[in-house]
């Protein structure tokens, strides 16, 4: 299987970042994980420095000024050592075979997104499934997640493009990455993919 670089910006999100990291390491292929620490003060950098993982890369903005998620995604994608990149948030958890399911749909010139499963904190939408696997880290259980998320998998295409998204690094760089106009807003993905299509 081709390796993916999971690009994960994070700011003071250590407990969720650890969960995201573990979920990626639980996949059958050891992918590259690139964590972009954006001036965190919660021990994130210390935790990263203690990891003995040759496929964990870190970029540390010591602050005090933040770069923001848009700038950090762009920096991480530039740093990625694989041909395929995955925009992954620090509070996301990969389900079993997440990588295999994404890669079977990926080809040059396309963007593939994974359907998000979220607790009912935000409004429902066609790009996600509302189901509560725990709002806090200590409420989350990997065994329950892996068992129950299998029943949620469908082989269908949903409308919209949102994180987690995957594409070839070359395709991302060909359109110049994110537009700084949207930094650090939540519409950066929509703009990026409108320019890509």
Locations of the language-model features?
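Conserved donor NDP-sugar-binding/catalytic core segment of glycosyltransferases
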Residues: 97-134
């Amino acid at each position: 299987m081709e390796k993916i670089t999971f690009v994960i910006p994070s700011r003071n999100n250590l407990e969720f970042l650890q969960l995201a990291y573990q979920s990626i390491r639980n996949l059958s292929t050891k992918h590259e994980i690139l964590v972009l620490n954006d001036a965190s003060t919660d021990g994130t950098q210390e935790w990263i420095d203690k990891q003995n993982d040759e496929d964990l890369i870190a970029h540390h903005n010591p602050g005090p000024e933040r770069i923001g998620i848009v700038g950090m995604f762009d920096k991480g994608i530039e740093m990625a050592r694989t041909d395929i990149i995955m925009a992954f948030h620090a509070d996301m958890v990969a389900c079993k075979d997440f990588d295999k399911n994404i890669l079977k749909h990926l080809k040059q010139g396309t963007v593939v997104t994974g359907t998000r499963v979220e607790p009912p904190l935000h409004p429902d939408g066609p790009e996600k499934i509302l189901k509560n696997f725990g709002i806090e880290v200590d409420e989350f259980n990997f065994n329950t997640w892996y068992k129950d998320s299998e029943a949620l998998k469908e082989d269908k295409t949903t409308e919209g493009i949102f994180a987690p998204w995957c594409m070839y690094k070359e395709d991302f760089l060909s359109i110049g990455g994110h537009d700084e106009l949207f930094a650090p807003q939540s519409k950066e993905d929509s703009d990026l993919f409108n320019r890509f299509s």
